[in-house]
Amino acid sequence: MNKGSIFKMDNDFEKRKAEAGRIREKYPDRIPVIVEKAEKSEVPNIDKKKYLVPSDLTVGQFVYVIRKRIKLSAEKAIFIFVDNVLPPTGELMSSVYEDKKDEDGFLYITYSGENTFGASSI
């Protein structure tokens, strides 16, 4: 897992918090998500880190979005982690956001080709 989010390192807390606040105000039915690859993962890098995710999207549907963005073939596995935990694929992104959003207002998701942290769920 990343020692720290690159997005967090590149943008100070106040800037991130203000941006997430603006996003939530302008798009109340969307969730501001930052997606980053796990440090030692062999899967491809994602072309874009910031996403505005519909609240009613499931974790499984968002995994599909990530798969498409990194052009991962169907036979390769991908795992996403929120706070080093694998969220249930059927859970709504809005629920994960409410439980696990960062104090800056973003939800941070790390993806990997390996199940690095075991199979525990949120």
From Swiss-Prot:
Compartments where found: Cytoplasmic vesicle, Autophagosome membrane; Vacuole membrane; Cytoplasm, Cytoskeleton
Keyword Ribonucleoprotein: no
Lipidation (Phosphatidylethanolamine amidated glycine): 118
Keywords from the UniProt entry: Autophagy, Cytoplasm, Cytoplasmic vesicle, Cytoskeleton, Lipoprotein, Membrane, Microtubule, Protein transport, Transport, Ubl conjugation pathway, Vacuole
Superkingdom of origin: Eukaryota
Membrane association type: Lipid-anchor
Propeptide residues according to the Swiss-Prot or TrEMBL record: 119-122
BP terms from Gene Ontology: autophagy; cellular response to starvation; protein transport; response to ethanol
Function: Ubiquitin-like modifier involved in autophagosomes formation. May mediate the delivery of the autophagosomes to the vacuole via the microtubule cytoskeleton.
Family as reported in the entry's similarity comment: Belongs to the ATG8 family.
Subunit record text: Interacts with ATG4. Interacts with SH3P2. Interacts with ATG1A and ATG11. Binds to ATG1A and ATG11 on autophagic vesicles.
Protein name per UniProt: Autophagy-related protein 8e
